[in-house]
Structure formats: C-alpha cells, structure tokens
C-alpha cells in the first residue's frame, strides 16, 4: 500500500540504530530486497532502505552503546508540542525537538514504562511511503511489564484508545485512533528475560 500522508498520532516510520551498519544493511537487503541509499556524509552515515524507489525504513549508526534497536516514530503536527505533552504525561525527553535538514522535525522520548520512541513532524519526508507489503512495515507493538502506565500515557499524549483483544490473547491490547487500529501492546510475563526492557517492536 502506497502512502502519501499519515494522520497525527499514527506510527509512520521506523529506523534501526546499530553498531554494525555495514552488516545490518547487508543482512536486511538480502532478507527483504531493500535497496540501501546512503544519505551522504552530512547525514552521519544514515541510510534509507527503499523498495521500488520508495522509502520503507532507515538504518544508521547507533547513538548509544548496546545491542541494535528499532525505533518507532509517531507522526505529530508539532514535535515541540509533543515534548510538552510527554513531560506532562510523565514521560522523559531524551532528545529535544530538532530539524532533520528539510525532511522534518523530530524528538526522542522514553515512556513511563521505559520504552523509547520518537515523534515525527513531516515536511518533505512523510515517513514510510510503502507499507503492508512484503519487506515493509506492517505493525508496531509496545512490549511492556506495566500496561496500566502505558495506557494512561499514550492515551494522554496521542489520544489513543486502548482496547483489549481476547482473540489475540488474554494480555493483548489494540491501540486505536478514531476507531482505526494503529498498533498493539503485549504484556511481558516471566517468560521474557528480566534484562529485556520495555520496547516498541516492529513487524515486517
């Protein structure tokens, strides 16, 4: 499905931060058939992954030590206003709002359960231009041990509704925006290693 815009409050982009960018680009291009387009030295090695000339994800050098991590971006009308909303709702601002050339404006946050995510205020780059097809983003899912905190936070910041989904399991929640399903939440039980923090997972 081709996309030309995203409604505010909708997950719209993902990127991978990795300590081995060359290895990651080789792996994902072989797995998904991505064409990797280096954005130039001014972008610090950041690359766009494309299918048929349409951007579907980003890959860049990790900005923090540790294992590779995928970041989910949520479209907003104003990244600066999102900073205030996140603070008010009890989240933590990891990176204040800043411009990405003429592509858009972003900020990075941690929710009260410890999951990191970003917001995206689009200008020339709307986010993923192709979704719900092989090799592209199909789903974003919050994985957390504190679902009640997460429900309160995301409903306040983005206006999401949290709806239990018994068909997907007793601990599964669908996030909806204006009655449209835009993501999910699963509760981490004791089967999850204790060292794994709350995080946003991405599905292709």
Language-model features: where?
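Short acidic, gly/pro-rich beta-turn/loop elements at beta-sheet edges
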Residues: 24-26, 59, 82-84, 150, ...
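Intrinsically disordered, low-complexity proline/glycine-rich segments
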Residues: 57, 183-185
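Core segments of cupin and vicinal oxygen chelate
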Residues: 6-54, 88, 96-104, 108, ...
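Active-site-flanking structural segment that lines cofactor/substrate pockets
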Residues: 55-61
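Glycine-rich acetyl-CoA-binding "A-motif" of GNAT/NAT acetyltransferases
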Residues: 55, 68, 116
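Vicinal oxygen chelate
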Residues: 1-7, 10-19, 48-50, 62-85, 87-138, 163-180, ...
